[in-house]
C-alpha cells in the first residue's frame, strides 16, 4: 500500500516558501509540513472513499494515534449558512460546536474517514484534538472514527458505505445512534460536548 505525497517533497516545499510564490502555494506548503509531524501514520487511497489515514504501526486501545494542537486550530470555522453559501461539501467539515464547522486546513485529521465500527475516536480540546484508539489497530489498517460522535445538524445526513458488518447505512446525528453505542462513546469521552447540549444549526436563508 503506497503512501501519498508526504515523501520527498523538500525541494518543492523550498520553492513554495519563496516569497514570490502565491499565498495559496505557501499555505499549502505549510500544510504539508504539518502532515510530516505524524510519524506513525500515512495517507493512502482507499477502495471507495478517496484518501484515508492509515497506521504505520500497531496501536493498543487507549493509545494516542495523533494529536493536532495549534493556537489557530479553530480559526477556519464557518456557520452552516456560510458553508452552503460557499458551496462546501458537508462531508468534509468537522462540526466543533453549535452551528460551528471547521473546514479542512491541510492537516492529517482532515482525511479521517467514517466507519460505523471505528478504530478510533476524537477528543476535542480548546486548542485542537486528540485521536485515540478504541480497539487494537493493526499496522496498515485505516484509522477511522464515527462521524455521528461530532454531528448535531438536522440538515445533514450522509449515505454510509463504510463496509462495516454493522453499517447503519446512514450517518446521522448523535441521538440517532443506538442507546448502547451512545453510552459507549460517552464513557470513552469521544464525543463533542455540543451533541449533548442540543445546539442549534441555523439553516435559514
State the predicted function of each range:
Residues 2-15, 116-205:
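C-terminal SET catalytic tail plus cysteine-rich post-SET Zn-binding segment of SAM-dependent SET-domain
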Residues 8-121:
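Catalytic cores of histone-lysine modification enzymes
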Amino acid at each position: 500500500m503506497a503512501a501519498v505525497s508526504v515523501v520527498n517533497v523538500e525541494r518543492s516545499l523550498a520553492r513554495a516558501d519563496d516569497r514570490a510564490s502565491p499565498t495559496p502555494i505557501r499555505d499549502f506548503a505549510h500544510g504539508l509540513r504539518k502532515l510530516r509531524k505524524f510519524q506513525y501514520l500515512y495517507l493512502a487511497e482507499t477502495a471507495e472513499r478517496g484518501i484515508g489515514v492509515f497506521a504505520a504501526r500497531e496501536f493498543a486501545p487507549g493509545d494516542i494515534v495523533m494529536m493536532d494542537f495549534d493556537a489557530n486550530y479553530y480559526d477556519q470555522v464557518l456557520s452552516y449558512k456560510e458553508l452552503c453559501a460557499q458551496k462546501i461539501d458537508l462531508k468534509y467539515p468537522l462540526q466543533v460546536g453549535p452551528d460551528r464547522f471547521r473546514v479542512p486546513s491541510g492537516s492529517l485529521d482532515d482525511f479521517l474517514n467514517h466507519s460505523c465500527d471505528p478504530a478510533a475516536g476524537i477528543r476535542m480540546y480548546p486548542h485542537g484534538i486528540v485521536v485515540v484508539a478504541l480497539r487494537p489497530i493493526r499496522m496498515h489498517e485505516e484509522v477511522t472514527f464515527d462521524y455521528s460522535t461530532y454531528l448535531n445538524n438536522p440538515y445533514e445526513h450522509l449515505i454510509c458505505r463504510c463496509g462495516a458488518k454493522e453499517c447503519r447505512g446512514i450517518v446521522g446525528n448523535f441521538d440517532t445512534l443506538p442507546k448502547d453505542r451512545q453510552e459507549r462513546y460517552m464513557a470513552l469521552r469521544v464525543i463533542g460536548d455540543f451533541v449533548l447540549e442540543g445546539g442549534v444549526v441555523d439553516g435559514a436563508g
